[in-house]
A protein has these predicted regions:
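Hydrophobic alpha-helical transmembrane segments in multi-pass integral membrane proteins
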Residues: 45, 86-91, 141-149, 183-184, ...
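Membrane-interface helix caps of multi-pass small-molecule transporters
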Residues: 19, 23, 35, 39, ...
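Hydrophobic residues within alpha-helical transmembrane segments
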Residues: 12, 16, 51-58, 74, ...
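Selected transmembrane alpha-helices and immediately adjacent juxtamembrane segments
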Residues: 1-39, 123-172
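Selective hydrophobic functional segments
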Residues: 47-96, 181-224
Length: 245
């Protein structure tokens, strides 16, 4: 596969996944991970997606700041930060092969949870105990520190504490901006953002911009449930393929 084809395929993945996050406020990194890490490698792919997700989330925060629920953001941030530091340590000190296997299991779990909520709506409506919610936030922080994709676990909590669509999207995007700023800072301090990472990130920017434009247009026009069922079905398959490959 030529480099041009690889970049085009990665760009198409970035467009689709970041359009979905522009609609919902969540999902771009975890959806893009199996494909982009397959094309660029685990660590390089994670770094590129972290930067792109930061840009997208910052755009939504700036344009939708009035929708942020600050007390919920603060609560979520405290528990997630505790796990984030552990995840960042693991990312820098664990080999890529074990990381990829952990990532595969995580993707399968996250996709399965989301699909179960669509098949059995009452599961998503059940109120979880506060302690369980806080544990999910902590675990989500660990996953986010490793792969910048702790969203699925954090969303399980936030979907109950932030039931309004606009509040949900804006508050979570502020969380992603905060967490990814810390992670990107660690990349800079460890000199892991190399020239290839910078170049590929720049190439992905037009695809990101197109995803934002389409996602904002679709936010008011397309049922997000239709998008998410198809996307998480694909994600589940991708996680299985990554596990057995």
């Amino acid at each position: 596969m030529t480099q041009a084809v690889t970049l085009l395929l990665a760009g198409l993945v970035v467009f689709v996944t970041h359009a979905l996050e522009a609609i919902t406020g969540f999902g771009c990194t975890v959806l893009a991970l199996p494909f982009v890490t397959g094309l660029f490698g685990v660590k390089q792919g994670v770094e590129i997606l972290t930067i792109l997700a930061w840009i997208l989330s910052l755009y939504i925060v700036i344009t939708k700041v009035k929708d942020i629920v600050w007390h919920e953001f603060t609560k979520i941030l405290i528990f997630v930060l505790a796990g984030l530091l552990i995840g960042m340590y693991l990312f820098h000190h664990v080999d890529s092969a074990p990381l990829k296997r952990i990532l595969s299991y995580f993707i399968i779990l996250a996709a399965s949870v989301q699909l179960i909520q669509f098949v059995f709506p009452k599961v998503g409506q059940m109120r979880m105990p506060k302690a369980v919610g806080y544990i999910l936030l902590f675990l989500g922080g660990i996953i986010h520190g490793m792969f910048s994709s702790g969203g699925p676990l954090i969303v399980l909590y936030a979907s109950q504490s932030l039931p309004e669509k606009g509040n949900f999207r804006a508050t979570l995007c502020l969380l992603w901006v905060t967490l990814n700023s810390i992670i990107i800072g660690s990349y800079v301090l460890s000199s892991s953002i190399t020239r290839p990472v910078t170049t590929k990130t720049l190439v992905m920017l037009p695809f990101l911009a197109a995803g934002i434009v389409f996602g904002e247009w679709a936010h008011q026009r397309v049922k997000k449930e239709t998008f998410k069922v198809l996307i998480f079905s694909t994600l589940l398959l991708a996680g299985i393929v990554m596990l057995v490959a």
